[in-house]
A protein has these predicted regions:
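Histidine-anchored nucleotide/phosphate-binding helix
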Residues: 182-197
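Conserved hydrophobic positions within beta-strands
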Residues: 77-79
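Gly-rich Lys/Arg/Thr-decorated short loops/hinges at beta-loop-alpha junctions or inter-strand turns
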Residues: 140, 163-177, 298
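Short, well-structured beta-strand-loop connectors
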Residues: 49-62, 81
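N-terminal, Lys/Arg-enriched amphipathic/low-complexity engagement segments
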Residues: 1-47
């Protein structure tokens, strides 16, 4: 019997329209907009000025603390401005704009290996591996964008026992990880070995949902050459890509409220991050591009693109046939955890796993009705929370009750809103309350 996590969960329609599409190369845009805060933690500090010439891989913003990440130029060109632009969350954030040099061959920084030759051997010490990952600006590519070098540096007294690779991709519509697994399986397995070496662990488990049988077969065949690494097929269930849910599915361990995965002896890394680690350590290549799914039921050409960081999302949408006439919303990410985007000028960042074009009929909110106390939201919550009560407490600004209801444990998967027969915007209220309670907790600690 296939494993899955044991608490809550739902089965929304998968709609993996681009599942069989190979990764396509995307033409370069005329300019890129590269935010300096594409990660959890402190924004990077710009190291370039207006008028500076940059190459692919030039560092344009450096870390401003331990929990931060370097930012590199994804193109050859000239810095035209450093200004504030809207991000995927609707906030104005500083970004560096680079006009792409036209009509000339791209210039890359020296030392970057652009070949596709597989490099298996890695003799670096753990600290050297982590330093290379940090220098390359690698962050979690599953959406959380937590700096990878921090994850590979457990706090004193904590010891990793197993590395879990998150290749679940449970979010409907998105197929970028699936496409990457099919095209870069050998590199991913080498990346797993590099991370095992960095953490000092002998065991790794690659968790893949059973709707990706081709990826499971391919990875399993290659994994036979790597002792201590196994591929674990998992039952299809949302939100299995959550760290705590994946740890429960793979290890049968539950991470306590407020605790980190390392408390269960686990470090979890997204499969896209693993490939980026391979490129950083074996090819000296910084994180300047990622695989992004562009999809939607009425989109002419749903695809998986290799997109340079900073590329306006409109450039990707145009490559997929342009916006359909009945477009209602453009979502950054998937339908469950993604956010509506304000403009097609918003750039691809390190965390942009997908761009979803929803038709009007699927993007119009239905009228909210009174809660009928059916408890469906409680049943499906993978964190064991009571979303209905949390929404009520947020409405009344009862922050004490909200905190006692463990609102900060919410992983914002949206299962509660999805299943609510009264169309109540549970997640919207919980997100608001979570921000407020988190701010109150930080204020108490300071």
């Amino acid at each position: 019997m296939l494993r899955t996590f044991r608490l809550g969960g739902i089965h929304p329609p998968e709609n993996k329209l681009s599942a069989k599409r190979p990764i396509e190369e995307l033409p370069l845009p005329r300019e890129v907009i590269i935010p300096i805060g594409q990660h959890i933690g402190a924004p990077a500090t710009p190291t370039v000025q207006k008028g500076d010439l940059v190459k692919v891989g030039t560092i344009i913003a450096k870390t401003s603390g331990f929990v931060s990440a370097n930012i590199h130029s994804s193109v050859t060109g000239k810095v035209t401005k450093i200004d504030s632009f809207f991000d995927a969350g609707g906030y104005k954030r500083p970004a560096i704009v680079i006009a792409v040099t036209q009509g000339e061959e791209e210039q890359w920084e020296e030392g970057i290996d652009r070949s596709t030759t597989l490099v298996k051997e890695c003799t670096l010490e753990p600290k050297e591996i982590i330093d290379r990952i940090s220098a390359a600006g690698i962050v979690g590519l599953g959406g959380a964008t937590f700096p990878t070098h921090v994850k590979l540096s457990p706090p004193p007294g904590a010891k990793a026992e197993v590395l879990i690779i998150n290749a679940v991709e449970c979010e409907p519509y998105l197929t970028s990880d699936h496409a990457l697994m099919m095209s870069k399986s050998d590199e991913i397995l080498v990346g797993v070995e590099i991370l095992k070496r960095a953490l000092g662990v002998s065991r790794a488990v690659i968790g893949v949902e059973n709707n990706k049988k081709d990826a499971i077969l391919r990875l399993s065949q290659i994994a036979m050459d790597y002792p201590g690494t196994e591929v674990m097929p998992l039952k299809v269930q949302y939100p299995q890509g959550g760290e705590k849910q994946l740890i429960d599915a793979v290890l049968r361990k539950q991470v306590k409220s407020g605790a980190l995965p390392i408390s269960a002896g686990a470090v979890v890394q997204n499969v896209g991050t693993v490939f980026a680690v391979y490129e950083a350590v074996q090819k000296n290549k910084p994180l300047i591009e990622r695989i992004t799914t562009v999809t939607g039921k009425h989109l002419e050409n749903p695809s998986n693109y290799r997109a340079r960081i900073g590329t306006p999302i409109g450039h990707l949408i145009t490559a997929s046939g342009g916006l359909p006439e009945d477009t209602g919303k453009i979502i950054g990410g998937g339908p469950m955890m993604g956010k509506a985007l304000l403009s097609t000028e918003i750039p691809v960042t390190k965390g942009t796993s997908g761009i979803l074009i929803l038709p009007r009929e699927e993007s119009t909110r239905r009228p909210m009705r009174n809660c009928i106390r059916c408890a469906k939201c409680v049943t499906v919550c993978p964190m064991g929370l009571n979303p209905a009560f949390l929404m009520r407490d947020v409405q009344y600004a009862d922050w004490d009750a909200t905190e006692k209801g463990y609102i900060v444990d919410c992983i914002e998967c949206g299962s509660c809103s999805y299943t609510c027969p009264a169309n109540r915007p549970l997640l919207d209220y919980i997100r608001t309350g979570k921000q407020k309670v988190s701010a109150l907790i930080r204020a108490r600690k300071s």
